[in-house]
Amino acid sequence: MKELTMLSLSFFFVSALLAAAANPLLSAADSAPNPVLDIDGEKLRTGTNYYIVPVLRDHGGGLTVSATTPNGTFVCPPRVVQTRKEVDHDRPLAFFPENPKEDVVRVSTDLNINFSAFMPCRWTSSTVWRLDKYDESTGQYFVTIGGVKGNPGPETISSWFKIEEFCGSGFYKLVFCPTVCGSCKVKCGDVGIYIDQKGRRRLALSDKPFAFEFNKTVYF
């Protein structure tokens, strides 16, 4: 009886190993992070345009850029900001995972974020997000554009963000904590909203994350 049981167990484990070997893609899919979903429950697709819509009402609208400082000085590259009006979705965004073959955007994975169909200023043609250096005047790390798409490594470390689930199904936050360079020391943190003296709602590292949903853009 014991011999029969041992034979049955051996057959089970061998069958399981053969099944896993025959289905490597299925095994990889099972271990992959969850896909990011839009407000319709559909998976976010790489390179597709989406609006970021804040979860909290009466706390601003979508995301865009501002090329002026609080004192009116022009800056380039511009800063990433949230619009003040809730009804204003403003500029669409596209997301590009570290793995260029990945066609689905997933949580907890390094990715580039860039504004679509937008020319920031004549000194830079890049609309890719990046985390700027520490701003001593405000004590903040601000999000700007002018980053580098792809080419993960030390030279592009400031251009990689992550999407994480936050406070319920369909709600998300942005995080800066890239893992594309194992030897690099980075300042990790959630991306939140910093309101300057002119009332501009600027994206910056914060202990209060900016919670939002994704809404697929529609062109007429």
Swiss-Prot record:
Expression tissues: Expressed in fruit pulp after pollination. Not expressed in seeds, stems or leaves.
Modification comment: Glycosylated; contains as much as 13,9% of sugars (glucosamine, mannose, galactose, xylose, and fucose).
Residues glycosylated per entry: N71, N215
Transcription among keywords: no
GO MF annotation list: endopeptidase inhibitor activity
UniProt KW keywords: Disulfide bond, Glycoprotein, Signal, Taste-modifying protein
Disulfide linkage: C76-C121, C177-C188, C181-C184
Domain of life of the native organism: Eukaryota
CDD domains, alphabetized: beta-trefoil_STI_VvMLP-like
Cleavable signal peptide: 1-29
InterPro entries: Kunitz_inhibitor_STI-like_sf, Prot_inh_Kunz-lg
Biological role: Miraculin has the property of modifying a sour taste into a sweet taste. This alteration of taste perception persists for many minutes.
Family: Belongs to the protease inhibitor I3 (leguminous Kunitz-type inhibitor) family.
Quaternary assembly: Homotetramer; dimer of homodimer.
Name under which the protein is recorded: Miraculin
Organism: Synsepalum dulcificum
